[in-house]
Amino acid sequence: MSTVYLVIPCYNEEAVLPETVKRLTDKLQRMIDSGRADENSRFLLVDDGSKDKTWELITGFCRENVYCSGLKLAHNRGHQNALLAGLLAAKDKADCAISLDADLQDDIEVLDQFVDKFHEGCDVVYGVRNKRDTDSFFKRSTARGFYKVMHILGVDVVYDHADYRLMSRRALDALSEYHEVNLFLRGIVPLIGYRSDYVFYDRHERFAGESKYPLKKMISFALDGITSFSVKPLKLISNLGILISCLSVLGLLYALISYFTGNAVAGWTAIVCSIWLLGGIQLLCIGVLGGYIGKIYSEVKARPRYRIEEFLP
């Protein structure tokens, strides 16, 4: 039997936590009874600086529930950092750790399959959605676009995989060697290597509360993923500059020919359009460069990714 830790990041999840803890306790007990997990297995609730009663609930669960552990971050650091904090806290206590969301959308009934594949020798097991029926048309379309862009840019990500995954202790040790401040675990974990496999599941509707990933956060998360793992946007800027330079030379030749043949067109329409076009392209390129420079600025400061305020083992 193996010691299995379930790592659950929480941010303002007071509406779902009681039901989440109830279901996780029942599932973990069944895993222990079936021999997939031992009595030292736990589910670790990580409070990412919540503003509601999330931590108050977690402390109560830890007093009453032998399988519950809690970790509180000193302030809100985002889902990825909260998840990393939980995984690294579980690293020396568990044979493997499985990360999942607190909103009960990840199907916990497939946890058995994760552990079975771990016992078969896999160090990383990815949870992959069978379909995206619970998402809106807009979210489905943007998600597909995101994964396609990532693959075009050469980033190794698993299609339709979020953060529902199992990692062995060896994989967690490898993960601890990555010190990026700008975290994108979906891109980092495949870089670890080791033997991996997939578990396919159906994602449920959110049990209660609201999504903690509105459109603004999703766009920011996608941009972080792109700029953290690929320099192709910078190369595209260079290629775009070469293309525009070539077009400018052709335009200049056309203008000179028109001037000397007496066919010059009066008016400023073409000039104004060119100025607006080139100005827009320049601003876009500056924005891309600024995004990369901002990441460099964050990384070189080497500030802590999170700070643990309290840990309830």
Where in the sequence are the language-model features?
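Conserved amphipathic alpha-helical interaction elements at protein-protein interfaces in regulatory
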Residues: D26, R30, G60, E64, ...
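Acceptor/aglycone-binding surface of glycosyltransferases and processive sugar-polymer synthases
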Residues: Y67-H75, H79-A89, C96, I108-L185, ...
